[in-house]
Regions:
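Short, intrinsically disordered N-terminal pre-domain segments
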Residues: 1-16, 27, 181-182
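Extracellular jelly-roll beta-sandwich "head" domains, especially the C-terminal globular C1q domain
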Residues: 20-85, 89-182
């Protein structure tokens, strides 16, 4: 067995199959319906919150982490990680479609975390939407990692926002949130 395979075996053994304590990890998938018939209007250059009511047919709470009932506030679409513990980590896979009114619009995404003087953001450039205007660009399958390193992150809502350089609309399919316990 190669050194790489031996190391992988040691990691998997130490983490009970690859992710913390056995039986405590899991996920909840929140499927949105609020934007299906009324897409979110995006004004060029303005950060806009992504709603998620969790009422979609594909919402799945059957595999939630042990001791966790919710990971999202479905009244506003913000992540609510107050049932987690310091040291826990989440992977978030967001699935949404942006339809720009102008070709070559720049799309950015961010999480807003913390509160008050401790407010901070995690931002990323998604890219240019350059296949034409008036067509939907679906963004999914790119997970983001957020760890609970302090109570400012753990105890406050985490907002999901997009910014498009031109006007457009957003339809949210939902967010799957995987919990990895310390």
């Amino acid at each position: 067995m190669s050194i790489r395979n031996e190391l992988l075996e040691q990691i998997l053994t130490a983490t009970a199959g690859g992710g913390g304590s056995s039986g405590t990890n899991g996920f909840i998938d929140y499927n949105d319906t609020s934007t299906t018939s009324s897409p979110v209007v995006l004004n060029g250059g303005v950060w806009t919150s992504i709603p998620n009511n969790g009422l979609g047919a594909f919402t799945n709470k059957a595999y939630s982490p042990s001791g966790v009932t919710e990971l999202m506030d479905t009244s506003n679409g913000a992540l609510d990680l107050s049932e987690l513990a310091l040291g826990d980590t989440i992977l978030v896979r967001n699935d949404y479609t942006i339809t720009p009114s102008t070709n070559n619009s720049l799309l950015e995404f961010r999480y807003t975390l913390g509160a008050g003087g401790g407010l901070y953001t995690l931002e990323k450039i998604i890219g240019r939407l350059d296949s034409g205007s008036g067509i939907g660009y679906r963004r999914s399958l790119l997970p983001d990692l957020i760890y609970m390193g302090d109570t400012n992150t753990l105890d406050n809502p985490i907002g999901l926002e997009v910014r498009l350089s031109a006007s457009g609309v957003l339809v949210n399919a939902g967010s799957a949130i995987q919990v990895i316990r310390q």
